[in-house]
Structure formats: C-alpha cells, structure tokens
C-alpha cells in the first residue's frame, strides 16, 4: 500500500512539473485586454505628435493647409478629451482659427481643397468646443452646404454629380470628399433627415456597383459586387481602374466610406444597399492591404474600415471562407505591429495620397484605434 502511494506521489509530481511550465508559458504570452493595448499604443502615437510632429506655429504638416493639423487634433482628443486646454492643443487650435475665412470656410489661402479642409477642421473644432466655437461652426456648416453640388451649381437630381462634394472650388465631386462632408454635418448635429445629407445620399448610392435602388448610372450593373468606387461624375472614375466591359472597379477604402455614409444617412442594416456593401466587405476582408488598391491608401483604408464597422455595430465578421474576425482586436494588433520605434506610423511601401507623411498617417492610425475601443 505504501509503495502504491509513493508511485502515485511520483506521478503527481511529474504531472505538476510537466503542466506548470506550459501554463507559465501561456500566461507569459497572453495578450493584455484590448483597452490596455489601445491605450498603450495610442499614447506612443500621441507622444510622437506632441514631441516631434508639431511646428512652432501649432501646425502639423502645414503644406497640406489646415487638414493634417485638424486630423491630428481630433485624433489626440479622441483619446485624451481633457487635453483641450493643454498648450500644444491650444496652439494647434489657434492655427486652425487663423484659417477661418470670411465665407465661413476653414482653409488655407488660395486652397483648392476647401471642402476637405473645412470638413476635417469641423471635426477638430467640434471635439474642442465648449461653446467658444459655436458661431464659427455654424458658419462652416452654411459654407459646406453652399458648395454642395446641387441646383445652385445648375444641375438637377438626375445628374450623376448631384449631392456630391469635391475638394472645393468647383472640383468634380467624389465619394471621399462627400464622406468627409457627411461626417462633418453629422459632427455638427445634423440628423439623417437633413436635406444636405439626403442629397449626398443620392450621390453616394451612384458610386456603388449595384443596380437599382437609386443607382441609375451606366456603370451600375457592369460589376455588381456591392462595393464602391471613387466617382460616377463626369463619366465616372475608379482609382482601381476599369474592367474590360467598362465597369468601375470597387475597392476597400471607398466601400467603407460608402457604407459609413449610408449609415449616417439613415439606411438600416436590412437595406439592400447596405447588405450589398457588407457582402463585398466579407468577400474582401483584409488588413494586409487596401482591397483593390494594394498598399496605396492603406492607413486611410484602416480609418474608414474602423469608422464604418463601428457605425454599423459590427463586432464579429465572417469572411468569404466563413472564418470569424474580431475586427477591433485584429486591427489593433496590426497597428501595434506596424508602429515605428518613435511611436509614429508611416506607409513605407506606398506614399501615394501623402501616406509618407508621418503626422497624417499617425492621425489616421489614432483615429482607427479610437474606433476599435468598445
């Protein structure tokens, strides 16, 4: 009996010695909770912007006008809302204020990107507003609605350009600028039934590769994958080029921009246009590239990806193979992996659309992380 007890004891000790190191190893590689991963990563990015990214006049990458400065301010305040009164943010806000024009727009002198600059500046001023910017924001709203492509530009609702926004100063409307415009109106408190947002919806649905449901363009049925492209105006254009039959190829960043904007305009998850967009997203789920565009616009893609899925209330996405994806966690981990030693992000593989600019790309990454938070 005593011998049996000794054998049992020996096997028990061996089992303990075998299991304990494995358990210890598992504990060592376990990920911190999502919030901690986001906060730690965002703090490094914010430190980069505040320590290395800001100029003496308060701006970030001023060669792009006010846009990058506004995106950086908004990105920082998304993570640190109490930083509004910090010296760095106050300097940046003063720089943005210096770009407020008599027509209500917020843009650099002589800018050809008036809608884009004003729309993103609105996002920053809304985040920092405690009442001090009420008047400026009201005037910015009037400016944005005034330059929307509608009857004021001499076109009817049947025109493919109707309801859209371009960079400004009569530039052809496109989905990217229209998405920034709709987001600005939403930030300003406009509801889904706002007239300008509903006009924008007419343009947005015409950028989708889907027949019917308000899409009467010649390109609507040539691909039919539910994704979105750059613009249907002036004959149409996709940054992902065309198919042999003249179809305008869908790509990732515009599809997420389109989905987000449709949701802001009040379309439900059951609407055929939203369903089709989600089908494209599931069939082209990726964090390694901007589907249809490779590495071009990758961080712009990440930020539209996160904003759209957050707006859609999506938590787990099944891809084309039926594999489930916790997109918030996966995108956070991808951004952790890509963060530079100095805390910044940059698109080292493709600098198209200014993604060689660390301040801009870091702002995109921080905005993405903010929407990964639950």
Question: Could you say what each language-model-derived stretch is?
Answer:
Residues 1-5:
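N-terminal secretory signal peptides that target proteins for export/translocation
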Residues 8-20:
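Bacterial N-terminal signal peptides
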Residues 53-54, 97-100:
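A non-catalytic alpha/beta surface segment that caps or lines the substrate-entry region
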Residues 50-56, 316:
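Large, well-folded core regions of big proteins
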Residues 25-44, 59-88, 102-142, 147-333, ...:
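An alpha-helical repeat/solenoid feature that recognizes helix-turn-helix modules
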């Amino acid at each position: 009996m005593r011998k049996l007890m000794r054998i049992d004891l020996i096997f028990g000790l061996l089992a303990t010695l075998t299991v304990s190191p494995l358990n210890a190893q598992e504990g060592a590689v376990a990920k911190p909770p999502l919030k901690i991963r986001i906060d730690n990563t965002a703090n490094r990015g914010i430190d980069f912007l505040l320590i290395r990214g800001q100029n003496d006049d308060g701006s970030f990458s001023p060669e792009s006008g006010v846009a990058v400065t506004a995106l950086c301010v908004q990105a920082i305040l998304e993570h640190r809302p109490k930083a509004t009164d910090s010296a760095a943010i106050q300097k940046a806000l003063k720089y943005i204020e210096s770009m407020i024009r008599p027509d209500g727009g917020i843009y650099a002198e002589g800018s050809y990107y008036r809608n884009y600059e004003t729309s993103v500046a609105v996002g920053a001023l809304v985040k920092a507003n405690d009442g001090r910017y009420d008047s400026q924001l009201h005037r910015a709203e009037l400016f944005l609605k005034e330059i929307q492509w509608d009857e004021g530009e001499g076109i009817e609702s049947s025109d493919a350009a109707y309801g859209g926004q371009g960079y400004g100063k009569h530039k052809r409307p496109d989905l990217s600028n229209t998405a920034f415009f709709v987001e600005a109106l939403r930030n300003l408190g406009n509801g889904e039934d706002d007239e300008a947002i509903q006009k924008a919806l007419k343009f947005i649905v015409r950028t989708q590769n889907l027949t019917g449901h308000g899409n009467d363009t010649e390109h609507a049925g040539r691909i039919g994958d539910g994704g979105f492209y750059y613009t249907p105006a002036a004959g149409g254009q996709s940054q992902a080029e065309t198919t042999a039959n003249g179809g305008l190829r869908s790509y990732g960043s515009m599809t997420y921009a389109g989905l987000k904007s449709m949701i802001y305009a009040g379309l439900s998850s059951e609407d055929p246009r939203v369903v089709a967009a989600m089908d494209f997203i599931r069939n082209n789920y990726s964090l390694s590239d901007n589907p249809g565009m490779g590495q071009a616009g990758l961080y712009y893609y990440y930020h539209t990806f996160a904003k759209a899925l957050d707006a859609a209330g999506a938590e787990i996405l099944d891809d084309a193979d039926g594999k489930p994806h916790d997109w918030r966690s996966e995108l956070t981990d991808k951004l952790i992996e890509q963060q530079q030693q100095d805390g910044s992000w940059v698109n080292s593989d493709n600098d198209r659309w200014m993604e060689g600019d660390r301040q801009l790309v870091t702002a995109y990454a921080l905005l993405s992380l903010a929407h990964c938070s639950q």
